[in-house]
Amino acid sequence: MAETETESITTSSPPPISETENSTTLPTTETEKNPNPVTISLRIWPPTQKTRDAVINRLIETLSTESILSKRFGSLESEEASSVAKSIEDEAYAIASATVFGDDDGIEILKAYSKEISKRMLESVKAKSNVASPPPKDGDGIESAVDSKIDSSEA
């Protein structure tokens, strides 16, 4: 006859783990002291001086070298572009800093700053373009051509 082996397995419950040893539960006193210990706050306003200098350098480059603006309005000399760029950035920074937004990270203020820089850069090159080439006199130029079309359509 075949012999059969009998195995006996005995199981026992592990000892109870105390609440302080339980790794899945944080102690309530610690949670109350610091509810979110890994909160990271990133603010993009105000920009660092290094960032502001980079903005000024980019403005100088845009105003003094060939760009979309220079093709349409002409470019500025390096020294003039430098002083214009500094004043554009300073004014835009002052306006944006005075603007009050409810966001915590400064994104809306940064948008206002960027918008002011763009607006002032365009105003500067347009003003320079108008000084460099005064508006055409009667009889030559776009204004007189438009005026003559209006006059002929009224007749």
Curated annotation (Swiss-Prot):
The keyword rRNA processing does not apply. It comes from the Eukaryota. GO terms for cellular component: Golgi apparatus; nuclear matrix; nuclear outer membrane; plastid. Residues 146-155 have a biased composition (Basic and acidic residues). Keywords: Cytoplasm, Golgi apparatus, Nucleus. Residues 1-41, 124-155 are annotated as: Disordered. InterPro entries: WPP1/2/3 (IPR044692), WPP_dom (IPR025265), WPP_sf (IPR038214). Expressed in roots, stems and leaves. It is found in: Nucleus envelope; Cytoplasm; Nucleus; Golgi apparatus. Pfam families: WPP (PF13943). Residues 7-39 have a biased composition (Low complexity). Residues 28-131 are annotated as: WPP. Binds to FPP proteins. Interacts with WAP, WIP1, WIP2 and WIP3 through its WPP domain. Interacts with HSP70-1, HSP70-3 and WIT1. Component of a ternary complex composed of WPP1, HSP70-1 and WIT1. Regulates the mitotic activity in roots. Plays a role with HSP70-1 in facilitating WIT1 nuclear envelope targeting. This is WPP domain-containing protein 1. It comes from Arabidopsis thaliana (Mouse-ear cress).
